[in-house]
Amino acid sequence: MKLARRLSVVEPSPTLAVSAKAAKLKAAGVDVVNMANNHALDYGPKGMQDTFNAIASSKLPVVGIGHNAAEAYRPYRTVIHGQRIAIFGALDWLEPALIPAWSATDTQPGVAMSIDRTRLVAAVRAVRPEVDTLVVFLHWGTEETYCASPEQQDLARTLLAAGADIVVGSHAHRVFGAGKVGTALVAYGLGNFVYWREDGESGRSGVLLVTATGREVDTYSWVPARITNGVPVPETGGPAAADVTEWQRRRTCSGLAP
């Protein structure tokens, strides 16, 4: 999704949001948004500039896009209960023909990419000594699957080796399982959240809750929901328990431990 109003369309699709939505997200309590996704430049450079303007006026912190590479690969930083936290955002899935025009470079606005891992890995390594907990949020994976590909698993391990403590992602429109790789946490897919489809697997949603102390992930859990009229509604009782059990089961095919 992008926050724009000009309609110089690269890819006709229902991915345009009015700029006021940025302020609404901030008012709702959203701390930071990963804007690196495969629709970020559907409306071209003018649409991206409108997105920058909307972000600036709302003061909503975002990661994963920027006026240049330094900005796009810059993490959001905050301190919670004395713990220094950094959150990166990047895109790992895009049609190859679009990559040059969409990638943030030293002289070009655009999206942070992990397709070429070099810059993202370097950014993670550079920030690692300065924070207690480091999170990377990726837009990645194959749509309508719920098992991580070998490429995803390799990228997750690469980022963990570079210093990430938590790797989280989305894009497949499916809820993946989550689990440990060593002492780190990986959640390959959080599914849909606010979305127009609500049937079957597309309607499976939820919130991943994680507590961490420094580099140690203390607890993690899944609060399941079902999308109803476009928004997630928390589940209760038997349906909630069944969805949590399925979420736990799905970690196995992605090579994750409890």
Question: Which residues are covered by each model-predicted region?
Answer:
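Acidic, metal/ion-coordinating pockets
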Residues: 29-258
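Conserved N-terminal helix/loop that builds the PLP phosphate-binding region
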Residues: 1-28
